[in-house]
Curated annotation (Swiss-Prot):
In the dimer, the N-terminal domains are swapped between the two monomers, such that residues of both chains contribute to the active site. One of its GO terms (cellular component) is cytosol. Mg(2+) 1 binds at residues 85, 104. A motif (Nudix box) lies at residues 86-106. This is GDP-mannose pyrophosphatase. Mg(2+) 2 binds at residues 100, 104, 151.
Length: 191
Protein backbone atom coordinates (compact mmCIF):
# COMPACT_ATOMS: atom_id res chain seq x y z
CA UNK A 1 0.00 0.00 0.00
CA UNK A 2 1.38 3.41 -0.93
CA UNK A 3 1.09 6.49 1.23
CA UNK A 4 -2.09 8.54 0.89
CA UNK A 5 -2.23 12.27 1.54
CA UNK A 6 -5.48 14.03 2.44
CA UNK A 7 -5.48 17.84 2.52
CA UNK A 8 -7.30 19.10 5.59
CA UNK A 9 -6.56 22.83 5.46
CA UNK A 10 -4.58 25.23 3.24
CA UNK A 11 -4.38 28.70 4.78
CA UNK A 12 -2.43 31.56 3.17
CA UNK A 13 -0.43 33.32 5.91
CA UNK A 14 1.26 35.86 3.64
CA UNK A 15 1.30 36.75 -0.04
CA UNK A 16 3.35 39.96 0.11
CA UNK A 17 6.04 38.84 -2.33
CA UNK A 18 5.92 35.05 -2.31
CA UNK A 19 3.26 32.86 -0.74
CA UNK A 20 3.57 31.40 2.75
CA UNK A 21 0.98 28.72 3.48
CA UNK A 22 0.03 26.78 6.57
CA UNK A 23 -0.88 23.30 5.34
CA UNK A 24 -2.64 20.69 7.47
CA UNK A 25 -2.81 17.20 6.00
CA UNK A 26 -3.31 13.59 6.99
CA UNK A 27 -0.66 11.13 5.88
CA UNK A 28 -1.78 7.51 5.73
CA UNK A 29 1.27 5.34 6.25
CA UNK A 30 1.93 2.09 4.42
CA UNK A 31 0.74 0.17 7.49
CA UNK A 32 -2.59 2.07 7.49
CA UNK A 33 -1.88 4.40 10.42
CA UNK A 34 -2.92 8.02 9.87
CA UNK A 35 -0.73 10.88 11.08
CA UNK A 36 -1.84 14.51 11.02
CA UNK A 37 0.84 17.05 10.05
CA UNK A 38 0.77 20.83 10.14
CA UNK A 39 3.54 22.53 8.14
CA UNK A 40 4.39 25.94 6.75
CA UNK A 41 5.28 25.87 3.07
CA UNK A 42 6.98 28.72 1.24
CA UNK A 43 5.98 28.96 -2.43
CA UNK A 44 8.34 31.21 -4.34
CA UNK A 45 7.80 29.67 -7.76
CA UNK A 46 10.33 27.65 -9.73
CA UNK A 47 13.70 28.87 -10.91
CA UNK A 48 16.65 28.27 -13.20
CA UNK A 49 20.40 28.68 -12.85
CA UNK A 50 23.32 28.56 -15.26
CA UNK A 51 27.08 28.20 -14.97
CA UNK A 52 29.00 29.89 -17.76
CA UNK A 53 32.40 28.37 -18.54
CA UNK A 54 35.22 29.11 -20.98
CA UNK A 55 37.11 26.03 -22.08
CA UNK A 56 40.05 27.95 -23.56
CA UNK A 57 40.64 30.24 -20.56
CA UNK A 58 39.61 27.56 -17.99
CA UNK A 59 37.32 30.12 -16.33
CA UNK A 60 33.78 30.41 -15.03
CA UNK A 61 31.50 33.42 -14.60
CA UNK A 62 29.86 33.86 -11.20
CA UNK A 63 28.14 36.78 -9.52
CA UNK A 64 28.30 38.32 -6.06
CA UNK A 65 25.25 39.96 -4.54
CA UNK A 66 23.53 40.70 -1.23
CA UNK A 67 21.18 37.94 -0.06
CA UNK A 68 19.10 39.03 2.93
CA UNK A 69 18.37 35.47 4.13
CA UNK A 70 22.10 34.76 4.51
CA UNK A 71 22.55 38.01 6.41
CA UNK A 72 19.70 37.10 8.78
CA UNK A 73 21.39 33.71 9.28
CA UNK A 74 24.78 35.12 10.31
CA UNK A 75 26.56 36.03 7.05
CA UNK A 76 27.89 39.37 8.31
CA UNK A 77 28.08 41.09 4.91
CA UNK A 78 25.13 39.24 3.37
CA UNK A 79 27.18 38.89 0.18
CA UNK A 80 26.95 35.55 -1.62
CA UNK A 81 28.94 34.28 -4.60
CA UNK A 82 26.69 32.25 -6.85
CA UNK A 83 25.76 31.23 -10.35
CA UNK A 84 23.44 33.41 -12.39
CA UNK A 85 19.83 32.50 -11.54
CA UNK A 86 16.27 33.71 -11.59
CA UNK A 87 12.65 32.80 -11.07
CA UNK A 88 10.76 31.47 -14.09
CA UNK A 89 7.74 33.72 -13.65
CA UNK A 90 5.89 32.89 -16.90
CA UNK A 91 9.00 31.92 -18.91
CA UNK A 92 10.22 28.49 -19.90
CA UNK A 93 13.43 27.56 -18.02
CA UNK A 94 15.77 28.09 -20.98
CA UNK A 95 14.22 31.45 -21.89
CA UNK A 96 14.47 32.53 -18.25
CA UNK A 97 18.12 31.65 -17.94
CA UNK A 98 19.07 33.36 -21.20
CA UNK A 99 17.39 36.56 -19.97
CA UNK A 100 19.04 36.32 -16.55
CA UNK A 101 22.48 35.68 -18.08
CA UNK A 102 22.30 38.93 -20.06
CA UNK A 103 20.90 40.94 -17.13
CA UNK A 104 23.22 39.61 -14.43
CA UNK A 105 26.47 38.70 -16.22
CA UNK A 106 26.25 40.67 -19.46
CA UNK A 107 26.82 37.54 -21.58
CA UNK A 108 24.46 36.56 -24.38
CA UNK A 109 24.89 32.80 -24.34
CA UNK A 110 24.65 30.56 -27.39
CA UNK A 111 23.95 26.87 -26.93
CA UNK A 112 22.86 25.91 -23.43
CA UNK A 113 22.75 22.42 -21.97
CA UNK A 114 20.16 21.43 -19.39
CA UNK A 115 21.60 19.09 -16.79
CA UNK A 116 18.84 18.32 -14.29
CA UNK A 117 16.04 19.67 -12.09
CA UNK A 118 16.36 19.61 -8.29
CA UNK A 119 14.43 20.60 -5.19
CA UNK A 120 16.96 22.45 -3.00
CA UNK A 121 15.01 22.66 0.28
CA UNK A 122 11.98 20.33 -0.02
CA UNK A 123 11.16 20.30 3.68
CA UNK A 124 9.46 23.67 3.42
CA UNK A 125 10.10 25.35 0.05
CA UNK A 126 8.25 24.38 -3.15
CA UNK A 127 10.89 25.67 -5.59
CA UNK A 128 12.19 23.32 -8.30
CA UNK A 129 15.40 24.63 -9.91
CA UNK A 130 16.41 23.86 -13.50
CA UNK A 131 20.22 23.60 -13.86
CA UNK A 132 22.05 24.63 -17.04
CA UNK A 133 25.61 25.12 -18.26
CA UNK A 134 26.85 27.01 -21.32
CA UNK A 135 30.18 27.88 -22.83
CA UNK A 136 30.91 31.59 -23.19
CA UNK A 137 33.48 33.69 -25.00
CA UNK A 138 34.56 37.31 -24.70
CA UNK A 139 32.79 38.05 -28.00
CA UNK A 140 29.44 37.18 -26.38
CA UNK A 141 29.69 40.04 -23.88
CA UNK A 142 26.66 42.21 -24.67
CA UNK A 143 26.93 44.56 -21.66
CA UNK A 144 28.58 44.93 -18.25
CA UNK A 145 25.92 42.91 -16.42
CA UNK A 146 25.12 43.85 -12.86
CA UNK A 147 21.41 43.12 -12.85
CA UNK A 148 18.37 45.33 -13.14
CA UNK A 149 17.57 48.58 -11.33
CA UNK A 150 17.00 47.18 -7.82
CA UNK A 151 19.97 44.77 -7.94
CA UNK A 152 23.63 45.45 -7.17
CA UNK A 153 25.47 42.53 -8.76
CA UNK A 154 29.22 42.17 -9.21
CA UNK A 155 30.31 39.94 -12.11
CA UNK A 156 33.25 37.64 -11.35
CA UNK A 157 35.33 35.78 -13.93
CA UNK A 158 37.41 33.22 -12.06
CA UNK A 159 39.66 30.29 -12.95
CA UNK A 160 37.74 27.08 -12.26
CA UNK A 161 40.53 25.95 -9.91
CA UNK A 162 40.10 29.12 -7.84
CA UNK A 163 36.30 28.74 -7.71
CA UNK A 164 36.68 25.14 -6.50
CA UNK A 165 39.18 26.25 -3.84
CA UNK A 166 36.67 28.91 -2.72
CA UNK A 167 34.22 26.13 -1.85
CA UNK A 168 36.77 24.63 0.54
CA UNK A 169 37.54 27.99 2.15
CA UNK A 170 33.84 28.80 2.60
CA UNK A 171 33.89 31.77 0.22
CA UNK A 172 31.36 29.93 -1.99
CA UNK A 173 28.48 28.58 0.12
CA UNK A 174 25.58 28.52 -2.31
CA UNK A 175 24.24 25.02 -2.96
CA UNK A 176 23.36 25.42 -6.64
CA UNK A 177 26.78 26.94 -7.33
CA UNK A 178 28.65 24.14 -5.55
CA UNK A 179 26.67 21.56 -7.53
CA UNK A 180 27.38 23.19 -10.89
CA UNK A 181 31.07 23.82 -10.19
CA UNK A 182 31.56 20.21 -9.12
CA UNK A 183 29.62 18.98 -12.15
CA UNK A 184 31.86 21.01 -14.45
CA UNK A 185 34.99 19.81 -12.64
CA UNK A 186 33.97 16.13 -12.91
CA UNK A 187 33.00 16.41 -16.58
CA UNK A 188 35.40 16.54 -19.49
CA UNK A 189 34.08 19.92 -20.64
CA UNK A 190 36.83 22.16 -19.33
CA UNK A 191 39.95 20.00 -18.87
Amino acid sequence: MSQKITLIKDKVLSDNYFILRNITYDLTRKNGDVIRHKREVYDRGNGATILLYNREKQTVVLIRQFRVATWVNGNESGQLIETCAGLLDNDEPEACIRKEAIEETGYEVGEVRKLFELYMSPGGVTELIHFFIAEYSDSQRANAGGGVEDEDIEVLELPLTQALAMIKTGEIRDGKTVLLLNYLHSSSLIY
